[in-house]
Amino acid sequence: MGFSRTKIISNGGGTNPLGYTGAINLGPVEFNKINKAPKNGYIEDEVSFGNLINKELSDWYTYRTRTHNIESKNNVYLIKLNNNRFMKMRILNYYCGKKDQDCRTIMCSRQQAACLTVEYVLAKNGTDIFPISKFDSNASLTTESPLNIN
């Protein structure tokens, strides 16, 4: 997976012809209700107008024109990794140390931007079954959040 501010690519297809990583966007469903990954249907990266894009991952946020802030749609994504493992993930936040709702009415600074907080769970090795996530998305964001990508 590659992250660059709001752009996410999967390292499969147009990005890496030898990588078979792809994604499925399930929309804003309950994270822990997704307990099994399908074997097929994963969309890989493609080249579109000279840019790499994964159409399943490109629409993960809403841009707020009034505050100029990025707000996660809280979609759940299934990812098939190169090593035939499966992962489910959702982006919880775009701003370091702040919850999305803290940035809805005020402008969060550029220094706080592009510090994604991602909830993710890997399927048990050799299976397509996901264990239940122990992360509480209502908890305060700290350095102990599931995955902070700077």
Model-derived features: where do they sit?
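Surface-exposed, beta-sheet-biased, low-hydrophobicity segments with strongly acidic/polar composition
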Residues: 1-150
